[in-house]
């Protein structure tokens, strides 16, 4: 497989990445902390690709990235009011909440747990990709399991070139 390198400065970046996500592919996406390895969090086959690409144990649950507060109830239930207050105060940003999962969230995403982790990344391009894909994106850090976190597209390229569908380059100087 040839890995595409998509510049966040390109108007087609989000659309291309979202289409890859919608068709079950893997895209490395930027967050405010590290690059994530993203796939459709509701598509079991796509989620399994994340575990395979990372060499991640399947008993390690994934985080669902969403566009905002309005999506919490789509994937979670029995949500305490405090969760909405936290999301209002800290999203978008590096706050992850673990809440009871709806049945629509695959067991492979939650590692069989009754809960799911949700967060709203503070990256405009990543939220745009999530919105255009129309699904939450399961995205653990893009590093190979056990290796240091991937903070640049170059790190992602080193670990995954030819093994994932695309890398969204946050900065043009981040070119792999």
What is each stretch, according to the model?
Residues 1-173:
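Active-site-adjacent structural elements in enzyme catalytic cores
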